[in-house]
Amino acid sequence: MRHYEATEYILSFLLGDATPLDISGKIRISRHAQMQHSPDYVAYCRPEEAKPYHRVVIVPSGFFDYEQYGRAESMPTLPLAEWHGMPLLFGEPREESLETPYGTRLIIYADLVASSYFLLSRYEEMYYRKRRDEHGRFPGRESLAYRAGFLERPLVDEYAAELRRLMGEIGLAVQPMEPGFSSVALTHDLDQPYYSSGVRGFLRLLLKERLSLRAAYRNTFSRASEDLFFSYGRFLDWNVETQRKCASPVRTIFFIKTPSPHPLDKPNYTLRNHKIAAIMRLARRRKVEFGLHLNLYCSEHPDAVEAAKVELEKELGESVTCSRHHYLAVREPEDYNALLGAGIYHDYSMGYADVAGFRLGTSRPVRFINPQSLEVTDLILHPLTVMDYTLHDEKYMHLDYAEAERVALAMVEQAYKYHGEVTLLFHNENLLLDDPHIYHTRLYRALLRQIIKLSPAPDIVGL
């Protein structure tokens, strides 16, 4: 059965961590090197096919059947049934118990495997190929999770917690989902690393933005630290403080673009630019990690990913194994194969730009499952918890501060509840002191304080 590898991985993800031993982005952990088999006493089969020693049987709904997979019949219909208070995509919301010589057997007719697979693999994005926005992205508001009202819930993690609880009730020892953060990634995309640089930047400020000659000159040719968008020193101090005060592993990642012919990838820059060089010196002193910010040209032409990676590695003088797409513009699920082909093993693009929520149905890092081939790959997808532009931009959620804080804190707390990973994305141009119409400096600080409060290091009081 071609779905065997995928269903085995889903079971292991539901019943254990099933995440790489190293999630730093520095080491490739092969799916073959890391054993990820479900326990022998758990089976995904029809009740009559169960072995005598099977204590838990999850009954397939037919989703993976050849006649159904990839067809209209495989898509969930609204309204969804509920299983133990959770939306159920496939199967029947019931279970039954059966006494056997090996102990109580739990038969679950809710197809938790297919329901989890649908979310983790972005199956609907493969099926609805024509549902794309102007950047080729599948809109979050088109997703089943948004339309069914559970996008802000990590539903796969909820399934996992409830399944483990039920297994404990029949005397099986399972790994509990203890609250906490598996790790915290404080990420910053260098989309607009500076306000102005070079002669073209100077002329833009002078002629288009109508700045005075003195102001245009100061913003363009002065020291990098005097640039309007140079907020790096301040927020890196906050990140370092969070790393010191948080019990969970905390790291900072800068995602850096390479030059592109796409008009929306401007400004194009290289690390030789004097302002970029100053940013990089500061970042290296603060132990920042670097990833590839895949430009829109790479989104439209996945075969360009490898060249972009080689170019960035040459400029950095070090290898790069993690990435994020500019505009979060991952177009088709199978486009992720280009990352693997280029030697990228960790991606941080998995959030919707237009609405906050758990795009993959989980707060935990998970392997990319190709819904076309059903292959479980070596690429690790890190769910995006919060992005600044999603919250305030008029094209997206357009929230005021109070509502943005509520949404963002709730996402962080959900990740904590299920021992997930928090990944924050805040841009340097939104972390300014003197820009009162955008609230992200205040919000970013509030999120860092909450992370420390939930997972404080020993004998440390919050910020």
What are the language-model segments listed below?
Residues 1-271, 364, 371-463:
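Terminal accessory/targeting
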Residues 216-218, 223-226, 235-337, 341:
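Long, K/E/R/D-enriched contiguous segments that form extended
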